[in-house]
């Protein structure tokens, strides 16, 4: 997944360019790795410009990665491909539900993509569907801490899933927008992870 390559690329670049403190040996290793890693990221981004099939969540994930690659690497082709996808408009309705209604999985992937789009473009309008969805999700938490999934059109339908993968979204959006209810939700998710002995968040 190209998205998972980007944090490592940013780290290597920050060390190699001296934007982050590192000893000489680490800086040398990062400087050697950076062009190799950048070539991989560019190849992956180039492949994404050709798009193809895609459900709504794939489109937003691809558009967000392309926009971030444009921000980090330049390349007008990345932005052009992302813009073509974004012309379709968000599939998040006024209630905060995305088209696939996948509260147990794909809604949070859409949220991640919208957050990345906001960061990559500097356009805070991309936060709006995230806020609507996270607000809706506060009403989707069952008494046992799991998520209501019975209206999903995807494979999470009817499954018992806990909201741990929403943790960073609530934490980030709570901080960025100074929304105490989102920060409280992040704390409650962490407490639920502890209560149920769940694996740590990804």
What are these regions (language model features)?
Residues 1-51:
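N-terminal catalytic cores of secreted or lumenal carbohydrate-active enzymes
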Residues 32-202:
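Extracellular polysaccharide-recognition and catalytic grooves
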